[in-house]
Amino acid sequence: MKINLLKNAHAAIAALFITMFAMPTTMQAQTSYELEIADTKVTSANCDDLSVINGVSGTVKYDPVAKVLTLQDAIINIEDGHGIYSEVKGLIIKLIGTNKLTAKKAAIGFREALTITGGGTLYAESLSDCAFYAIETDLIIDNCVVNAKSKLYGISGNSSTSEKLIINHATVTAEGTERGSIRDFAAFTLIGCNITQPAGAAFDPAKRCVALNGEMVKSKVVITKDPTAIETPIADNRVAQGIYTLSGVRLSGELKDLPKGIYIVNGKKVVKP
């Protein structure tokens, strides 16, 4: 019996040392990305299944190499904070099925160019801020359905000096009942779609908003896809240049100087023997 106890004690001590040494390694290996879902940081540990975050359900996942956030029949509901906040350069939100974001602050706020695409539908509502908030950057809505609603701002830029809004073959509604439905953009481009509500509304470059009879529109703006329009793909210059690990960490130097392994080189997977 004593021998067995001694063996068990030795095994327990060995397991403790292994755990102590393994924990820092695990912690160091985790990578954080410039992306938050329901005010929770996206990392290499949770990016494959972001439905583990409180207030998130459905399929929500992030590919750090392709910089694609996939929403598939997803619901993101946060009582105090942002639904999605991004500082990822060239982030793509891919919509599959019907998705709903509800947040007290911005439903989607971003400081780097954002493209929303995928063919699905998104309902984005802010209870006390912007449904979409482009902070000194551009927003592209491409071949999908987007509905933005807030009692304050619908789809909004920040300074209105540099932000650009492009809607390409998409159906969009925007409503900001107190401060404007689509506003604070330096430029607004419609490709293969038109403003159909309110009748006669258009982007006013001087006021930098969608206006009607010289006044900013605060009721629902409806942009309808033209079924007869020829599809116009938007050039994609977002492929990450350089060498990255599979977890999305950028590496310095040249491939020839790196150890054996699998890397992402200029957006393509490369195996170094």
Each model region followed by its residue ranges:
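Generic low-complexity segments that are intrinsically disordered, proline-rich and/or Lys/Arg-biased
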Residues: 11, 25, 29-31, 199, ...
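A composition-driven surface/loop motif
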Residues: 29-226
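C-terminal segment of classical bacterial N-terminal signal peptides
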Residues: 16-28
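C-terminal outer-membrane/trafficking sorting elements
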Residues: 228-273
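Generic structural signal for beta-strand residues in well-ordered domains
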Residues: 22, 62, 86, 109, ...
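Bacterial N-terminal signal peptides that target proteins for export
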Residues: 2-14, 25
